[in-house]
């Protein structure tokens, strides 16, 4: 008999929570027939101030195959949580997962901007990205630098040397998921290398909590401003300096605006 799953869950608590969260979100999206245009990230929605999509797009998946591939790879990469003795571990995993979600999202929008503004490729203006692959590819890259002898197991059947996994998985994903976003995956790889080489570093509990706090604030206020969710207990008033919002609590409304109409140009990441 193999090792009971229970022990892996105990040793990979953060990974287990993320896999569960992404799976539940996928189920809700399917059950509620929520359109991916409502949760995905695109250049147009980013410049309109829908910053909350940077989080929802990362946690949402377009198909069960996409979900299974990402979660299978993520589960294997959860070995990072078991490597506290070499400077990794659960805290490191949580700290830099935050970094990967935010920085890879910002980077992919930056690349879209360059392609649109400099090279006049308007196709990328409306491409909508969804999926956790940016983070998955980022962790593949980090592990390939810090633990090059490790293996990446996919679906419990395929085992890849971690040193080549980011690029092998890039090819494999393109084959099984034709809509896979090359730029989204590349963004995760680049941020992963930046973390591995110390270009992005210094994360500790204080900075992680500070970053998480700002993520929550930006998420809530951008969600309110975009009108995607009716936080009627929050009201943003205009001041002389419009960059400094005033907040009032005036009621309690919870109205989710969701559409089942899909958006053309969806890319999975």
UniProtKB/Swiss-Prot annotation:
Keywords annotated in UniProt: Hydrolase, Membrane, Protease, Transmembrane, Transmembrane helix
SUPFAM superfamilies tied to this protein: Rhomboid-like (SSF144091)
GO terms under biological process: proteolysis
EC number: 3.4.21.-
Compartments reported by the entry: Membrane
Gene Ontology molecular function: serine-type endopeptidase activity
Assigned GO CC terms: membrane
Transmembrane segments: 9-29, 60-80, 97-117, 127-147, 157-177, 182-202, 203-223
Membrane topology field: Multi-pass membrane protein
Active site: 133 (nucleophile), 185 (charge relay system)
Top-level class of the enzyme under EC nomenclature: hydrolase
Superkingdom assignment: Eukaryota
Main location: membrane
Similarity field: Belongs to the peptidase S54 family.
Role: Probable rhomboid-type serine protease that catalyzes intramembrane proteolysis.
Protein name (database record): RHOMBOID-like protein 13
Taxonomic classification: Eukaryota, Viridiplantae, Streptophyta, Embryophyta, Tracheophyta
